[in-house]
UniProtKB/Swiss-Prot annotation:
<feature type="binding site">
    <location>
        <position position="427"/>
    </location>
    <ligand>
        <name>ATP</name>
    </ligand>
</feature>
<feature type="binding site">
    <location>
        <begin position="105"/>
        <end position="112"/>
    </location>
    <ligand>
        <name>ATP</name>
    </ligand>
</feature>
<protein>
    <recommendedName>
        <fullName>Type 2 DNA topoisomerase 6 subunit B</fullName>
        <ecNumber>5.6.2.2</ecNumber>
    </recommendedName>
</protein>
<dbReference type="GO" id="GO:0003918">
    <property type="term" value="F:DNA topoisomerase type II (double strand cut, ATP-hydrolyzing) activity"/>
</dbReference>
<dbReference type="InterPro" id="IPR010979">
    <property type="entry name" value="Ribosomal_uS13-like_H2TH"/>
</dbReference>
<comment type="function">
    <text>Relaxes both positive and negative superturns and exhibits a strong decatenase activity.</text>
</comment>
<dbReference type="GO" id="GO:0005524">
    <property type="term" value="F:ATP binding"/>
</dbReference>
<dbReference type="InterPro" id="IPR014721">
    <property type="entry name" value="Ribsml_uS5_D2-typ_fold_subgr"/>
</dbReference>
<dbReference type="InterPro" id="IPR020568">
    <property type="entry name" value="Ribosomal_Su5_D2-typ_SF"/>
</dbReference>
<keyword id="KW-0238">DNA-binding</keyword>
<dbReference type="GO" id="GO:0006265">
    <property type="term" value="P:DNA topological change"/>
</dbReference>
<dbReference type="Pfam" id="PF02518">
    <property type="entry name" value="HATPase_c"/>
</dbReference>
<keyword id="KW-0067">ATP-binding</keyword>
<dbReference type="InterPro" id="IPR005734">
    <property type="entry name" value="TopoVI_B"/>
</dbReference>
<dbReference type="InterPro" id="IPR015320">
    <property type="entry name" value="TopoVI_B_transducer"/>
</dbReference>
<keyword id="KW-0547">Nucleotide-binding</keyword>
<feature type="binding site">
    <location>
        <begin position="96"/>
        <end position="97"/>
    </location>
    <ligand>
        <name>ATP</name>
    </ligand>
</feature>
Amino acid sequence: MSSEKFTSISPAEFFKRNPELAGFSNPARALYQTVRELVENALDATDVHNILPSIKIIIELVDPQKQIYKVNVEDNGIGIPPHIVPNAFGKVLYSSKYVLRQTRGMYGLGVKAAVLYSQMYQERPVEVVTSPINSKRIYFFKLKIDVVKNEPIILQKTSVVNEKNWHGTSVTLYLYADWQRAKQKIYEYVKKTYIISPYAEFFFKDPDNNVIYYKRLTDKIPEPPKEVKPHPYGVDIELIKFMIVKKDKPVPVRDFLINEFQSIGDVTADKILEMAKLPKDKKTTELTDEEISRLVEVMKKFDDFRPPSAEALSVIGEDLIKLGLKSIFNPEFAEAITRKPKAYQGHPFIVEAGIAYGGAIQPSPEPIVLRYANKIPLIYDEKSDVIWKVVTEEMDWKRYGIEEEQPPLVVMVHLCSTKVPYRSAGKESIADVEEIEKEIKLALMDVARKLKKYITEKRKEEEAKKRLITYLKYIPEVSRGLALFLVGGDKQKIGDAYSDLREKLLKIALNKLEVNDKKLEEEIRNYKVEEL
């Protein structure tokens, strides 16, 4: 009987064999995913560093026979140090995003998965042009990934003098793609990205030479997230071991707890060590696996920790959400809310919600749902997302004044967290987590109450208008009768008296019915009735 042969493969080879795990399941999805990964990197290189983003996206068909497209995304961000570029684009699971703060990316995979997919169907390398802020040179790279070794292959590296003090990054990828099937999703992605980042400007040119430009509407950038220490509720045995190894030298376990974790001070550290039956002065490198396991178990069950710090999070903010919704949908009503920070499994999170109603919004059987996670629009896998579930199944919109069978309603939800519970590495839908689901519903209820108040007031005004119009029908007849009486029946003199009486009676009607809406009042004044 022959024996099985065991081998290992590199992370690069694993994702080359399984591109669908990173969202590259077919030529259409691959094109969308490439644009998305490059735009996310561009935004993280700009707004996180308080730079107003200017992002250019160009897609060109360069080989019609083989369906090879060229994708270029350029930003005005902080740039990439030249010694970092090869690994940033040529080493899978190498990233600046393995930190405890909110980032758009989280796996160190995105752009490398695009490079791997690119290599599978054509021979051109990824091209990177970058210049860090205050750099005197602009650097040019052509790279591929050594799939077996998971290492970058540098095909070309040059630099030129930075005469115009440009800073930022431009990335060009060539890939086998299907523009016609990806077109709608890419346009949707760019539009939805702009909705929550109206402080950015986007230039987009597609393979059909169509150009769209979203202009910057404000200079207000959300407060960027800060890196924080781990919260005790989010630890596990391997994390503790990793943190111990990462320390330059052994330290007493008490000092380790106080200095390496948030929410642990002197008193709390003493309580934890007492419950875990560990001496305060024992060195971290002397801890056995059983002692580390005990320590983690106590930290998980300890009740007196403060909630995780929300400093690691960056919300969009109510003003920017409303601005984005108004600019794209032109509604008659737009409101938003940002909830207070909550936590799940030791990770802080914040839910934001926005609603736009009426105006230019097209009626539809179900609300138009805009889903976001860490400022990323989620386009695919809508029905499997907890946001969709809450909006369409758990919210009774009729309770909030929406009675239409096909309401003109847009519902936006944004979840930001140091760890978004995505259902897969493709980052397209959020899993059902009880704490998050509850906060989404509470956020929607909060903003829906504002919508109900608006709809109620609007209906009152419409009823007032109907009643006033009823009165108006009698004003000409009453005015003419009184005018004739005042001028002694002389129809030649009735004109001025009639106009004066008609205006006075109209004012009485407006005041009596408490019409305070100037627009409505003007509409009523211009209302034409048949004068008897």
